């Protein structure tokens, strides 16, 4: 009963705030939604404590959902170690975001609707991580996509919010369709979509092949690649990352919830959940490693030149997701989930601090129009500093324990893809430290560039916003140290059967014996980025400006500022051709052509022509009508007295045509 209550409490809170918000008021909506999410958090902590102490796993059968032929799908909830970790992360971050939003959105007239959306978002994420099969997971998958549309477009009178929400929806629909194809591939070959049955049958079908355009492809490779592309869209990996920075158009608590604990982490969760499949597909693991490392490097370079406060933090999310994915590609799924849980706390802290800064600065998000906030917002500055240091991987903070270990495992794999991931991830760590320090400089450490009246009215966060920041700061400092041995400690049996790693792919032991130089290199480069940015922006700012306006510097700056021209390529080369095909083929040839000719216009034209031909038979001569009656009588007699085989016998047809010509 406790497990079902945990799942449906956020849904009840969402319904109460959404349907009865007018009657219970703004405070009532805030209280109910925050309370239900908080209770879910408490219950998830109780459940994971029982799981750790007693090694329990739970499967709750609710009912049969779909039963059609060979397709049988039940509505079940699975509670294993992976699910419980995700539940703790989702519900704890969601509770703090709810509490923060109660004050941050206090002056918004639609607060009840906003709180309802947040709770619904949390509910669908819980459905996603507790699903016992791919179909139930897909319900939660689509639910978080739908809720992200509602939340990004919460201020629906703003054109940019409309465009950002539609963009997020469209990009995710593409990846969701490919994910669905992956699920259908699994069902077609295994005849089930339940996790346990599917994973148990993988060893049987792993050698199945099929021919596609003269290429021999493995069933497992195709299914894994399709599932990974679905995860790429949800977790904003390179090529499908376009929606992530635009999602900053929503309220800041939405950004914190999406980036820290819900939507973008769903792809990493799905990859870890399908680890028994991926372990039999070395090709897909290599692709995941390359895509993850490329994303980590790409996003860290783009973050160097951004000036929007929230977009800098958003690109850091994209970069950190790359680390999680290439950890999965290196078959170290527990390490990826470890980094996911660590990242959730310091990323939520960074976003909520950015919301406090934007709120204090009168909704200004351009960091060039800030400065000097360390004196005006001292508490927010300290919290943001803790989150930034944890993001950089500063020694003994939460981010350090997972981020550096991912890079060590990458080098210890002793493979081309592993070393590719190590070097790109290490360079990405340098850039991460650089743009984090740049953000600190412009927002907090430099002389202020804000208007005088804004500085006068700026104030630090109230208690309702300060409590979540303090708790997240605690997590950003200690969670990594506390949970490291449980997540990735040698000999830890915490994960049981929820994650499978092929013994030949496990590099955790090898990572312990790396040369010291390769272990320390990411930390050294992070410090170089930290002190390098500090030195350049404090003492050599003119040098940076001259470098930027130089011939090659300007080209490089534009390349990064335009996000490697991905938007330009997609809009001008892909979207334009697709739109032209949509107009010239789909609209003009099919919709207004084939369908119209076979449909309304064609039928109207045919019947008009037939009516005109029938009119010609009305000659007004009685002998014409008598002759037609005679022909009709002969025709009917022919039908009655002869077999149906002779229905169209040649004599009758010739006679009918001859008389018809005489009439004309």
UniProtKB/Swiss-Prot annotation:
Location(s), subcellular: Mitochondrion inner membrane
Membrane topology: Multi-pass membrane protein
Top-level EC class: translocase
Catalytic reaction(s) noted: a ubiquinone + NADH + 5 H(+)(in) = a ubiquinol + NAD(+) + 4 H(+)(out)
Gene for this chain: ND5
Gene Ontology annotations of biological process type: ATP synthesis coupled electron transport; electron transport coupled proton transport
E.C. code: 7.1.1.2
Lineage, highest ranks first: Eukaryota, Sar, Stramenopiles, Oomycota, Peronosporales
Record key words, sorted: Electron transport, Membrane, Mitochondrion, Mitochondrion inner membrane, NAD, Respiratory chain, Translocase, Transmembrane, Transmembrane helix, Transport, Ubiquinone
Disulphide connectivity of cysteines: none
UniProt record similarity statement: Belongs to the complex I subunit 5 family.
Keyword Hydrolase carried by entry: no
Stored NCBIfam families: NDH_I_L (TIGR01974), PRK06590.1 (NF005141)
Gene Ontology MF: a single term: NADH dehydrogenase (ubiquinone) activity
Alphabetized InterPro entries for the sequence: NADH_DH_su5_C, NADHpl_OxRdtase_5_subgr, ND/Mrp_TM, NU5C-like, Proton_antipo_N
One of the Pfam families matching this protein, by short name: Proton_antipo_M
Described purpose of this protein according to its UniProt entry: Core subunit of the mitochondrial membrane respiratory chain NADH dehydrogenase (Complex I) that is believed to belong to the minimal assembly required for catalysis. Complex I functions in the transfer of electrons from NADH to the respiratory chain. The immediate electron acceptor for the enzyme is believed to be ubiquinone.
One Gene Ontology cellular component annotation held by this UniProt entry: mitochondrial inner membrane
Ranges annotated as spanning the membrane: 2-22, 28-48, 77-97, 120-140, 168-188, 210-230, 250-270, 285-305, 321-341, 342-362, 376-396, 424-444, 462-482, 521-541, 590-610, 614-634, 639-659
Protein name: NADH-ubiquinone oxidoreductase chain 5
Keyword Mitochondrion: yes
